[in-house]
Amino acid sequence: GHAANEPPVLVDALVRNYEQYKDVEIVHWVPMGKGEYCDPKMKGHLRHNAMFVGGPTRKAVQEGRADYTPFFFQQSSRFFSDGTFPIDVAMVSVTPPDKHGYVSLGVSVGGTKPACLNAKMVIAQVNDQMPRTMGESFLHVSQLTCCVEASTPLPELGGGTIGEVEEAIGRNVASLVEDGSTLQLGIGTIPDAVLK
């Protein structure tokens, strides 16, 4: 699962049992948890391939213990649909099923649904704290290989500390923005500094 769709109970189980796995690649966008799958002791067992290098994974990428595949977010659906990233197991958080047996992927649909539709196996953390969203967010329970019920708060991305460099970049960029402009911002301290 991507961002707040990351299933913490499943990720914790994967990390806790890492010695059972050999050369497993974890393809992930925005990591929200601790990123323990990037710990040096995971070598030979779990290897992270980050599509967005965030706090928990940055050091591992810099030290060569994890990979970075740059991409545009709008490409994420295609990457999983066209086989660029073949998925053996998709791990996601979902809502409890409705009376018709449909679960919602909740707050992070993006490439998560194509990953589920193209994975050989889908393991879902059924989380009653995941909000049900409408649109293309639904899977039927028959599309899930395995479900684990666990009520956990959704992961949240905390704000980083804006340092002198980010402050200077933010001032520079902000000086280029005209009054009344519409801004589309990314994640991190530099976009935060631009808004400041």
Task: Locate each region found by the language model.
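Conserved alpha/beta enzyme-core scaffold
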Residues: G1-K196
